[in-house]
Swiss-Prot record:
EC number: 5.4.3.8
Any one GO cellular component localisation term in the record: cytoplasm
Name of this chain's protein: Glutamate-1-semialdehyde 2,1-aminomutase
Pathway: Porphyrin-containing compound metabolism; protoporphyrin-IX biosynthesis; 5-aminolevulinate from L-glutamyl-tRNA(Glu): step 2/2
Source species: Escherichia coli O157:H7
CC cofactor: pyridoxal 5'-phosphate
Amino acid sequence: MSKSENLYSAARELIPGGVNSPVRAFTGVGGTPLFIEKADGAYLYDVDGKAYIDYVGSWGPMVLGHNHPAIRNAVIEAAERGLSFGAPTEMEVKMAQLVTELVPTMDMVRMVNSGTEATMSAIRLARGFTGRDKIIKFEGCYHGHADCLLVKAGSGALTLGQPNSPGVPADFAKHTLTCTYNDLASVRAAFEQYPQEIACIIVEPVAGNMNCVPPLPDFLPGLRALCDEFGALLIIDEVMTGFRVALAGAQDYYGVEPDLTCLGKIIGGGMPVGAFGGRRDVMDALAPTGPVYQAGTLSGNPIAMAAGFACLNEVAQPGVHETLDELTTRLAEGLLEAAEEAGIPLVVNHVGGMFGIFFTDAESVTCYQDVMACDVERFKRFFHMMLDEGVYLAPSAFEAGFMSVAHSMEDINNTIDAARRVFAKL
């Protein structure tokens, strides 16, 4: 047995499923998950000594690559002054100044510890601000594991939500309406059915949890217009896209202004950080200045703030996003060329430093139904064969891939060459 296999066997006796987040268990592709010893730049190194070109990037945060010296040094320096104070610090102010400068729609920002905390808190704030209970989310979009968000659509887009996890009371789920991504008609129908009851729409501006599905040109502006028409708030969940699709996020890339924005992943530079913020009048409703409660023992802790501040300063440097886009475009085009040579139908979506690989005969993938029609079994084989080639992709057909500026064009070309060999065997 490999060392990963031995560790996985031991872990399953002590940790549910052997992992601390379900997708890491390889249940979406089968087999034994890799246990990682270290990471540097664009590479992961497992406990058995094998190196992999990494396109997971810790599920998004590692936009600069692993073990970036600026972030590492910032963490070490901060740790020497103490790990957590439970009191305000100068770095929290500097971090808030930087975030609000980089994302102009955020007049104010509140730091939390995860993307789930950010979305959960933003929805609570939207409900408190509007005095309404219902929310709209989209089929195939994921906004963390808060009870009101673990909801699937019923038999039709306008049916009241049904829990898709045990432990979520139906009374919670009934306030969540699930519409179809990239389908404005379904959203208008929801508003027309509940014109005075919907507090907010929450949306991934690029859906990254049904692989990678960008918005159609009119979708996000259409959501903004509907929120304005019916008096609801628009929450853009940039936990995945923030600072990755563009410096000011996908909202800037697509030219839409939300009322609230949720951030995570990159904002922490590899440490557990989330944030939410937006319009000053909305944020003023948050405790302690307003009645909507939110708190956190480790929110804004000095280690995480130092890591995030260092990361965002590096991400804001000229050329970072041009490099991300160039590398991702080259990878997408190369994979499509290699698949075409082998006669394998493939769609590769990409925006900024995100991409998604779909084995499908369809010409495009724009919604959850399109994603579900893809060949998952072929993806599973592709994943394991690429792993054997030393390429680490997301171990699920429903997760986006992530590029970093630490990837070289040689890494990209080696990945395409590996895919060409794999496609020939699929």
